[in-house]
Amino acid sequence: MRRVLTGILTATLLLLNTLVLIGPLLVFALFKLVLPGRGRDHASGAVMWVAETWSEIDKAIFALCTPTQWDIRGIENLRRDTSYLAISNHQSWVDIPALIESLNRRTPFFKFFLKKELIWVPLLGLAWWGLDYPFMKRYSKAFLEKHPELKGKDLEITKAACELFKRQPVTVVNYLEGTRFTEAKRQEQQSPYRHLLKPKAGGVAFVLAALGEQLDALLDVTIVYPGDKAPGFWDLLNGSVSRVIIDIQVRELDPALWAGDYESDPVFRQTVQAWVNQLWLEKDERIEQLRWE
């Protein structure tokens, strides 16, 4: 019963925070639509400030209501005046609060590439739209074979989003697995990794091609939860999550990673894929080490 009450209290406070701050965020987002040039940049900065304040209050709510220990590592030299590409393993909706706890007001506010269906999430869908989060429509290979005219649509969205990102410092978050990890998915994929699904290099390659010269570094984020199963969001709300490890390794980005054409150059494509696969091998080993803690 105590956990239920804790969950209800935490959820209520988070909802109240959302209701209070989504209004100002959307007002400034509308200013972005009508103001030109520097006016738009100032409005965009105001949107980011509201989002960061929203996130800081969410952090305070979790600290007040839940006993979760956020074990955050590798944040000592992060900066807010530069741009980053962040990659992370993906297991649960709790990954989002984990990124907020570790990156908010330590780096530029982060942007995700979201599934198009998420724009319909009450309140949050509007907030994500106001924050210029790109909404992607994912098509299966079989569907694209029947509708070849849709091939490359996500690339167009990625390029358009990255053009917006060039106007100010940004942290672009990319989940290379493309979906949340489960053991069933790992076995279905026949993934060679113990704790990860196979990575997809295409999305990160397009971000590098569009923003490479603007990016200061790669943030290699590894999130580990206690136990054999990742917690759900309700588990976080009701205080069932005792500890979350967020390990951040800052890596240099080789300019060669955006020096070619990923779509048309098979040699360059193999180079990027090999780089991603090596990152994933090291991340898999890192997860194993952190789980033993």
Can you annotate each of these PLM segments?
Residues I96, T158-K159, K200-V204:
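Conserved glycosyltransferase catalytic-site signature
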